[in-house]
From Swiss-Prot:
Family statement drawn from the similarity comment of this UniProt entry: Belongs to the glucosamine/galactosamine-6-phosphate isomerase family. 6-phosphogluconolactonase subfamily.
Annotated EC: 3.1.1.31
Keywords: Hydrolase
Highest taxon, organism lineage: Eukaryota
Keyword Hydrolase annotated: yes
Function: Hydrolysis of 6-phosphogluconolactone to 6-phosphogluconate.
This protein's pathway: Carbohydrate degradation; pentose phosphate pathway; D-ribulose 5-phosphate from D-glucose 6-phosphate (oxidative stage): step 2/3
MF terms (GO), sorted A to Z: 6-phosphogluconolactonase activity
Any one Gene Ontology BP term: carbohydrate metabolic process
Record-linked Gene3D superfamilies: 3.40.50.1360
Annotated source species: Oryza sativa subsp. japonica (Rice)
Descriptive protein name: Probable 6-phosphogluconolactonase 1
Catalysed reaction equations from the record: 6-phospho-D-glucono-1,5-lactone + H2O = 6-phospho-D-gluconate + H(+)
């Protein structure tokens, strides 16, 4: 069910007022939610509040907040966290940063997700350098994937990163993803053999259809084991992929090949953050009732 509110609606979350012109709640599958926004600023504001609350709950329950990031425009949406009140109220000392995927380039390369994340986010908040787990750029892509999985396994042993109760996969508190126009998430592309991996936590590819060809990526079991997953989509070029990923009305061979459709938390919650353009293919039912912003 997709419900819309086309009028301004205010709701309070942790003493913070959130306002949006278009908001949606999508619940075709258990623990899935969809949110739509009129502007990028509204999306960034809501995403910051969402990340803040997941962080606070994770630190309260576990003593840590382990978040894995991806590339694309989503890092720019995290800039709100560098501003008041978050830059002062969040317990940055408990944050641990990982990457759900990375391009096999030097850290100072223009294509590096680490570089863009450092410039747009990490350099602006007091996260400890020792809590930032970037991917080794001094070895082959295969060795980098092996090394990264080893690092994560050590952190799971001491529970800096949680562990799934249903399998032995790491249970990140939040994995933040973007979606490509072809429906890829992280560096998991349509019809790629990496989608079939069950036992590996981190893998590598050398044939990405989007340059650069060599990449490191979390596997689907790791992504789906997270406590929280957020997928951010912007732009009309993502509309078809978003539709195939989340609409129950999709049929035929295209739907199963969309990696984003395979993102279904085992024991967690999935939230989609969409602008109007990326949500334009979705069938929506207009309602006049208000929408209460959920608490996490």
């Amino acid at each position: 069910m997709l419900s819309w509110n086309n009028s301004w609606h205010s709701s309070s979350t942790e003493n913070r007022t959130m306002e949006r012109e278009i908001v949606a709640s999508y619940e075709p599958k258990k623990n899935n939610e969809i949110r739509m926004f009129e502007s990028s600023d509204e999306m960034a504001t809501d995403l910051a509040e969402y990340i803040s609350q997941v962080s606070e709950i994770s630190i309260k329950e576990r003593g840590y907040f382990a978040i894995a990031l991806s590339g694309g425009p989503l890092i720019s949406f995290m800039r709100k966290l560098c501003e008041a009140p978050y830059n002062k109220t969040l317990d940055w000392s408990k944050w641990y940063i990982f990457w759900a995927d990375e391009r096999a380039v030097a850290k100072n390369h223009v294509d590096s997700y680490y570089k863009s994340t450092k410039e747009d986010f990490l350099s602006k908040v007091p996260i400890l350098n020792g809590h930032v787990y970037s991917i080794n750029d001094n070895v082959t892509v295969e060795d980098a994937a092996t090394d990264y999985e080893f690092v994560i396994r050590q952190l799971v042993k001491i529970r800096t990163v949680g562990v799934s109760e249903s399998n032995d996969c790491p249970k990140f508190d939040l994995i933040l993803l973007s979606i490509g126009s072809d429906g890829h998430v992280a560096s998991l592309f349509p019809n790629h053999p990496a989608l079939e991996l069950k036992d590996d936590w981190v893998t590598y590819i050398t044939d990405s259809p989007v340059p650069p060809p060599e990449r490191i990526t979390f596997t689907l079991p790791v992504i789906n084991s997270a406590s929280n997953i957020a997928v951010v989509a912007t732009g009309e070029d993502k509309a078809k992929a978003v539709y195939f990923a989340i609409s129950d009305g999709t049929e035929g061979p295209d739907a199963p090949s969309i990696p984003a459709r395979m993102v279904q938390p085992t024991d967690g919650k999935l939230v989609w953050f969409l602008d109007k353009a990326s949500a334009s293919f979705l069938e929506a039912k207009t309602k006049n009732d208000g929408y209460e912003h959920p608490k996490y």
